Amino acid sequence: MFNEITKSVIWNRQVLEISTGKIARQADAAVTVKMGNSILLCTCVVANKVKDGIGFFPLTINYREMAYSAGKIPGGFLKREGKASDKEILVSRLIDRPIRPLFHQAFIHETHITCSVLSYDPETPVDILAIIGASAALSISPAPYLEIVAASKVGLINGEFVLNPTLELLKTSQLDLVVAGTKDSVMMVESEAHLLSEEKMLEAIKFGFENFQTVIKLIKEFAKEAKKPKFEMQDLYPSSLKKEIGKLFAKEIEQAFAIKSKQERNANLALIHEKVLTHFVCDIENKKYNNYQIESTLKAISADILRNKILEQNIRIDGRSTTDIRQIACEVGLLPSAHGSALFTRGETQSLVSTTFGTSLDEQIVDSLEGEYKERFMLNYIFPPYSVNEAMPMKAPSRREVGHGKLAWRAINPILPNKVQFPYSIRVVAETTESNGSSSMATVCGSSLALMYAGVPIKAPVAGIAMGLIKEGDKFAILSDIIGDEDYFGDMDFKVAGTSKGITALQMDIKISGIDFKIIQVALEQARHGRLHILEQMNKIISKPNSELSKNAPSSTTIKIDKDKIKDIIGPGGKIIKEICETSNAKIDISDDGTVSVYAADRDKIKVALDKIKAIAVEPEIGEIFNGTVMKVLDSGAFINYLGNKDGFVHISEISETRIDKVSSVLKQGDIVKVKLIGFDNKGKAKLTIKNACKDHSLNNPKQKNNVKEDSEPEQRRDASKKRTWNEDNNTEMSEVITERKYFT
């Protein structure tokens, strides 16, 4: 019944198996990939006809994680898989990036690739298997796929590179890198790193590249037996068409590229585009040429003009040399109600970034195949249409926004303090208010500024830069800080973020058939110089975290209690902890190890909550001194309330060093006194003393009795309205206003 074809190889001490012919046989191509207990189904479906009027290659890639693959039922009200999670979107993009450039340029049939996780094994990297499966499916599909792609994951543990590390190993790794490519060149790199040098990063890329060659050989052998006939493709750029467009419009295109302003330049290029389509309208109607051929040929001619000027004259669109960085302007503290804010502007690209602190209750809960976990640091990248002057509605976050946000997250995450050093959850929102290339790297720079201004004790400032490539034969030029057109007409988008000490994130996408390691090495070194220049400009406005938090940030404190007391604080059905939160207006988080974190808007609210918690959880010890309130006065002494709900008795002889005839002459109901626990009677009632608690304490001074000091004075807190700006043009600090406020930690 089944005509199954299976190939396997030992890869990194595990069996990697790919097969076809058993599942999803009606799809143009369907491949099952297996490693360990992980099984993925990767399918490829290609439309038979091209849609009329289409002017691009409609490739859609979807990666899906089925809950049953990990023996789980989906959470939420509807117990089924819904919209794609962030991880599914990120892996979909990871598959897309090395594959898209390798289709024939003239191929515009709608193509859908779906990779579904059917069985999940945490010991194997399913994202890598998805790339391998998609490549294998394309290799046996009718789509004109020019090269076979494979991928590998690389970790760095104890100074040694590790191939395809497990999730557990990645927790201790200095590097989490995915590299994909063909047998001859690298196509895509994605990584998060803990301050790795450029040399070490290049070594890691080489290590990953060398180790996936085994998989490329496996897919080639598999495709020989299982492949189907490919679509026959025509020349995308008919020579007659290219000659005619060049003759009529090349001069106008060259003049348009001489305009430095993005808006004016784009307006001129759009006008030329309309002229070209109008000129060839009859040829389109007669089906001599199609829209895609005309638009692609126009793009190719435009690219040739731009690229030749860079390669031959070392001059870019905006007049910069290949290594020049656009002008930079920085400003912090411009949003007075935010906990931290910054505006980072580089040329015509601008990012407005805000930082907000929350409690552990505000952490993002993530439900994944590995299980449920929390993300303490959240970074949201927003790309509104107005940033590129487009009249479009605001929609839910796009795949691009999710991807750019995750890249910026990877750049910032390695330099954040741990939860012990900084107990807050952190949300960064980066809104791209202007865009002309490299907006994700502007997000990194703006996020670093906003975090430092907010007072987050990051390890070092971080900056990011996007590099480009123009390559013709053996001749190439690496471009620093690319703009939109250089990205669009160029051969590479290479983004590097890091501190002055090393790289924290790297992302590389190639638009040609691949590049060699010499180009990567040059790009990394040129990016390092650019990154240091950007950091220098950022440091002129703020070079280290503020020592104080914003007055708008929540106060917090943490105490440790006996684990056996947790149930007492929570109470039946959460009754006690709810009552504490309601009466104090504080948020309380209790960990299983007995760590209690209290968050509130000010110190007084925290104190109310802490007093109630201590009253329940803290057992007083003999010799301890407390603040107490006189509840009732008797002839023989007085009853004192201390630690919230605990009562004790002070005998008349323990009130003062001098003889007292009447207790009421010294103590009155409601008086605040210091008391010391000296023991318990035979019924377990606390015995207290006043005279030994504070011998120089004047009971007759009402101010002293009602103004008991806390054990520690509150520190200073910064006013968020403190504002600093830096503009590279005039090298002046424009304004600085400081207001102080007390807070409690």
UniProtKB/Swiss-Prot annotation:
Residues in S1 motif domain copies: 623-691
Xref: CDD domains: KH-I_PNPase, RNase_PH_PNPase_1, RNase_PH_PNPase_2
Record GO cellular component, one term: cytosol
Gene3D superfamilies for the chain: GHMP Kinase, N-terminal domain, K Homology domain, type 1, Nucleic acid-binding proteins
Domain KH: 554-613
UniProt keywords, alphabetically: Cytoplasm, Magnesium, Metal-binding, Nucleotidyltransferase, RNA-binding, Transferase
Keyword set includes Cytoplasm: yes
Catalytic reactions of this protein: RNA(n+1) + phosphate = RNA(n) + a ribonucleoside 5'-diphosphate
EC number: 2.7.7.8
Gene Ontology MF annotations: 3'-5'-RNA exonuclease activity; magnesium ion binding; polyribonucleotide nucleotidyltransferase activity; RNA binding
Region ranges (Disordered): 695-745
Cofactor(s) recorded in Swiss-Prot or TrEMBL: Mg(2+)
SUPFAM superfamilies on file: Eukaryotic type KH-domain (KH-domain type I), Nucleic acid-binding proteins, Polynucleotide phosphorylase/guanosine pentaphosphate synthase (PNPase/GPSI), domain 3, Ribonuclease PH domain 2-like, Ribosomal protein S5 domain 2-like
Main location: cytoplasm
Compositional bias ranges of the Basic and acidic residues kind: 707-719
GO BP annotation list: mRNA catabolic process; RNA processing
Binding residues for Mg(2+): D487, D493
Function: Involved in mRNA degradation. Catalyzes the phosphorolysis of single-stranded polyribonucleotides processively in the 3'- to 5'-direction.
Family: Belongs to the polyribonucleotide nucleotidyltransferase family.
HAMAP family referenced in this protein's UniProt entry, alphabetically: PNPase
Protein name: Polyribonucleotide nucleotidyltransferase
Organism: Rickettsia typhi (strain ATCC VR-144 / Wilmington)
Higher taxonomy: Bacteria, Pseudomonadati, Pseudomonadota, Alphaproteobacteria, Rickettsiales
